[in-house]
Amino acid sequence: MLVKVSVENFKSFDKAAELTMISSNKIRTNANHRLKIKSTQLLKYAVVYGANASGKTNLALFFKFFKDSVCNGIPIEATQMFCKNRQENKERESSFEIQITVGDKFYAYGFSAVLSRRKVTGEWLYELYQNGSAKCLFEREGSKRPVLNDGITLTNTEKNKFETYVDDFEGNETSLFLPEMNRGKKYSTRSKLLFFRDVYDWIQNHISIITPDTPLIDLEYYYDDNSLKLINKLIKTFDTGISQVKIEEITLDELSNALPKSVFDKMMQHVKNRMEEQEEPSFRMTMRSKETFFNIEVEGHSEPKVTTIRLHHNKSFYEFGFDEESDGTRRLFDLMDMLLNKREDVLYVVDELERSLHPKLTERFLQLFMQLHDEQRMQLLFTTHESSIMDQAIFRRDEIWFVERNAENASSIYSLDRFKERYDKVLSKAYLEGRYGAIPVFSTFDFREEE
């Protein structure tokens, strides 16, 4: 589970900013929103408010950047991701860290880099303990050799392999060492280096980021009758008018004609890469955009099977395509995986959860999410403008956060819990009145020409 994130000199975040999922021990409401791991109570939800251009989206982008950097390398566009409110920030270090739990172990992993040059200046991984102490598992400084903690005892075989990996990596200023220790390397269940695999796996497979520009995702739904029954049952609860969701098989040529060539080529390259990763390929993925919804299923080395969805509406004689649905209905399909997913220990990060949704539908979605995952290690962190859900009956005070820009155009993050409001306080009203900040401040404007 996510414990804490911190970021500095990234997008609109100039000075170090921090968001924590550790619960306050003074708040008694919604106790089921907490999960206890060892002696630490972690929150399952974080809702982030702020005016337009306050930096809310940049918080969501932090997770995308962090995951992309670990899994695929620091992206080329990172050269423009330093905080641009000060000239010196271009050559200043940026810092990124997440604290997480894997099983019942707590870790802090992070790195620093000069983004304008995509130059890694530091990297570290610590194991954290309940008494507040920490043990450095490995660290590196710039292009120097990564250093393993002296207290980690390796077998001769492991020691020789690790020294080889370090020798090969020494001098590298553009890559991270954590993914290097997971590139084609296998670990026995008794290995003292398992933390490399465990932390990397959590970042790669347990953070799910939902943004409009994330078209390729892995889903287990829309492929068989049982999952379709669940989807049909679920979609009816949202009063969209849809009475049935069906799948329809199409050819690769039809898929090619429905997509821009660049998008189709990129998708097929992704399929090819996935097939090459496995001796006997078997996977499913969904290709999704504002107007398209396609499922791709691969079994063995045969041609991928492609399906799309068709929709029936109440009292209608005709089927509808995905592109004929409203923005709100299409948005629901973006979020459906969050309700159906039964995997343990998943962090969902969603930018503008309420986009295109009616306020009551947003509230209903959150109620269902909380109800369906009440017993699971599953977290949801999302940004929103929807003040109607700023309600202590829905969220705890320590789950509500604000992002605000200061006079220097830099963003800061702070929690509602610092205001110590009464439990009967109408939070949404106080927020819109400006009590907590993080709302637009308008200047006057006169259409009349000056004389």
Model feature map: region roles:
Residues 34-36, 41-47, 51, 60-118:
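Conserved P-loop NTP-binding catalytic core
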Residues 77-82, 288-293, 384-386:
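Short Pro/Gly-enriched beta-strand edge/turn motifs at strand-loop
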Residues 213-324, 435, 444-451:
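Extended helical coiled-coil dimerization/tether regions that scaffold
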Residues 1-70, 305-447:
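Switch/communication elements of ASCE P-loop NTPase nucleotide-binding domains
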Residues 104, 132, 315-317:
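Residue-level detection of beta-strand-connecting loop/turn positions
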Residues 108-267:
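Electropositive, glycine-dotted interaction segments
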Residues 96-101, 125, 309-311:
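Short beta-strand segments that buttress and anchor functional surface loops
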